Amino acid sequence: MSCYVGLDIGGTKLLVASAEQDGAIIRRVRQDTPVDLQEGISLLHQMIAEVAAGRPIAGIGAAIGGPMDWQTGIVSPLHQPLWNDVPLRQLMQHRWNCPFTVDVDTNVAALGEYFCGGHDVPRLLYLTISTGMGGGFVVDGRIYRGAGGGHPEVAHQSVHSPFPRCQNVPCPCGSRNCLEALVSGNGIKALYHKPAEALTAAEWAEVEHNLAEGLRNLAAILLPDLIVLGGGIACARGQQLIDSLNHTLQERVRIVACPEIRLSKLGYDTALTGAIEISKRGLE
């Protein structure tokens, strides 16, 4: 009997899992991501063979950092500088002789939440808040894409903050006061000179205020039924963060319906779960 395989290709770790048709995971393995491209591709092949354990593979899905072209499967993840213009789909299909589907990790994670997170809504916005920040918007089971099939950069909206240290903050993208620069792990370290877990209650109040302002913008523009938060920062802060954001958004969102905010139930497996889903469903 055949199986499906999901790949979560990160800048520091590789996660690979095989699954049944219903998504139940059979085997999973984890390895550090090699810096060298050929070593990385070779290791992925070894991991796929390990989790498949001799069973035919019906499809492979992958989540990887951008930029990339999801239609051609050519990837150039920023956090893996030696992976430049890699024809990942071609390499995988040639080796495994099965359909291969790949997309930006936040899109894949959003699909994982949509199909496997227990949310019964047509429009779901998923945001990951970890070292960086990103998101994916799913409408009726399909990823929303911008002009030219582009990936909307929800974390690079400019946010007005009333706090002196959170004003005129440079972002690596070249702009200032981007949401990512105010609430991501890297942003928090730059602003507060400490990791998120060491913030005081007053400092967390600033972060939550800034995040709520960004979510208010997204609620007004995209009108999602639900916003799901994942990633290391959000998961570590947990329900305390969710309760604070829901309370604040109820006060700030006007004119449009206020979406509920939930914490991801998939934890750190959102992208891997989504990769398994697109190995079965594709992206069309």
What are these regions (language model features)?
Residues 14, 64, 132-133:
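Short loop/turn microsegments at loop-to-beta-strand junctions
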Residues 1-59, 69-72, 90-100, 112-121, ...:
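ATP-binding/phosphotransfer module of carbohydrate and carboxylate kinases, centering on a glycine-rich
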Residues 32-35, 83, 151-153:
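A short acidic/small-residue loop/turn micro-motif
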Residues 122-179:
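Glycine-rich phosphate-binding loop of actin/hexokinase-like ATP-binding domains
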Residues 28-30, 78, 146:
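Residue-level detector of high-confidence beta-strand sites
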Residues 102-106:
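Short loop/edge segments at beta-strand edges and connector loops
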Residues 58, 64, 139-140:
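A cytosolic small-molecule/anion-sensing beta-strand core signal
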Residues 73-84:
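A charged helix-plus-loop insertion that forms the helical arch/lid used to bind
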